[in-house]
Amino acid sequence: MDREIFRRGLMLVLSSPSGAGKTSISRELLRREPGLTMSISATTRPRRPGETDGHDYFFVDATEFGLMINRDEFLEHAKVFGNYYGTPRGYVEETLQKGQDVLFDIDWQGTQQIRERLPADLVTVFIL
């Protein structure tokens, strides 16, 4: 009798100081690992030419972002250079439930927030 074993996905968080190469490493991991999905952040910053909502970011206004914080919809969030950024919990949970691993390219403060909110499925790598 063949039984398929379901594995819940893992969160792989790469964090580093600016310029240490985490984005380059993330791109290479995504290229090599077909089961790996990049986390998509929500942001209040304006959309840049060529960016797609739901692919590059989830673009929301500041009011909606604040409501999302109040509803505890983020695994992590921060204000950076006047704009808000955050990782929507629902998107990540849905992806993990499908058995897909989720890659995060975030700073160490975001990593700490995720560790506090969802520690069981978390693998962290700090790049120097």
Name these PLM-found stretches.
Residues 16, 21:
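Conserved glycine(s) of the Walker
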Residues 56, 75-82:
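Flexible beta-alpha connector loops of hexameric P-loop NTPases
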Residues 24-73:
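N-terminal phosphate/diphosphate-binding loop that engages ATP/GTP or pyrophosphate donors
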Residues 63-73, 87-128:
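ATP-dependent NMP and nucleoside kinases share a basic, alpha-helical "lid"
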Residues 5, 31, 49-52, 94-97, ...:
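Conserved catalytic network of the ASCE P-loop NTPase/AAA+ motor domain
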Residues 1-12, 34:
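Extreme N-terminal, non-catalytic leader segments
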Residues 15, 42, 128:
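Alpha/beta-hydrolase-fold catalytic nucleophile elbow
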